A protein has these predicted regions:
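Short, surface-exposed secondary-structure junctions/capping segments
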Residues: 227-237
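Aromatic side chains
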Residues: 65, 108, 161, 165, ...
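Class I SAM-dependent transferase core
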Residues: 2-102, 108-112, 116, 129-138, ...
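Short aromatic-enriched loop/helix-cap "lid" or pocket-rim segments at secondary-structure transitions
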Residues: 58-60, 200-202, 230
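Conserved nucleotide-cofactor-binding alpha/beta core module
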Residues: 92-214
């Protein structure tokens, strides 16, 4: 199903109007993000204004600001607002940096980075998600550059990146990260190994470290694995 295809509302339910969506965004920020140690005022301000409802199917518009992930296409979701805010804050974004958003889906996080002043390459493998993401970013973050391709390969054409951001869960760190990240770059995402819960992480290169990256575990979270992220195409860290 096309994410942006028209879908009838359940009988008796109507979509909220623009002021109600604005109120829902304020409640999301004040009730979900601020009490959960989201302290970056830039992120809080942008999430008060980016219309997250445009990143999901019309029948899910009214749930766009709920504290839950929302289905997009089979196996893909729009992460819950708090998870996105926590990961973006952990990425320590700085204006002028170049970020690769892997699994950019319908473009919400890519647009968030672009509005923070970063140069954004959005990598997605699903053409339906790309269509929605391009439309969303054209309206709200037109500088985002979209690429279609396997997520496990990154995008060497636009490398190097100061930040590689996985907008979903991976089973291991893909090998492309070592080749496409700058010498002082950072990687942020969710990692699931074995039967454990996925865990958010931040990884950086450090001279003299015995492995390619020094990894800092952040917090446990829930998200499905991104496509084509098989452990055999990656390395341990």
């Amino acid at each position: 199903m096309n994410v942006h295809a028209a879908t009838a509302m359940p009988q008796g339910e109507q979509s909220m109007d623009a002021p109600m969506y604005a109120q829902a965004r304020d409640l999301m920020v004040d009730d979900q993000l601020r009490p959960s140690e989201i302290t970056d005022s830039r992120i809080l301000d942008l999430m008060r204004h980016l219309p997250r409802e445009h990143c999901v199917r019309p029948d899910l518009h009214n749930a766009a600001y709920a504290d839950t992930s929302l289905p997009l296409t089979p196996g893909r979701v729009l992460p819950q607002p708090l998870l996105t805010a926590r990961l973006v804050q952990a990425a320590k974004p700085s204006a002028g940096q170049h970020v690769l958003v892997v699994g950019a889906a319908t473009g919400y996080t890519a647009a968030l980075f672009a509005r923070l002043g970063l140069r954004v390459t959005a990598l997605e493998s699903d053409i339906e998600l790309i269509q929605t993401g391009k439309a969303f970013c054209a309206a709200h973050a037109p500088s985002v550059v979209w690429k279609q391709g396997p997520l496990s390969q990154g995008d060497a054409e636009s490398a190097p990146y100061d930040l590689i951001y996985f907008d979903g869960c991976i089973a291991a760190l893909p090998a492309f990260c070592a080749a496409q990240l700058t010498g002082h770059g950072r990687i942020v995402g969710l990692l699931q190994t074995g039967h454990s819960l996925p865990e958010a992480f931040s990884a950086v290169r450090e001279p003299g470290y015995s492995k390619p990256f020094r990894v800092t575990p952040l917090f446990e979270a829930q998200a499905p694995l991104l496509p084509s992220m098989a452990p055999e195409s990656s390395f341990s860290f």
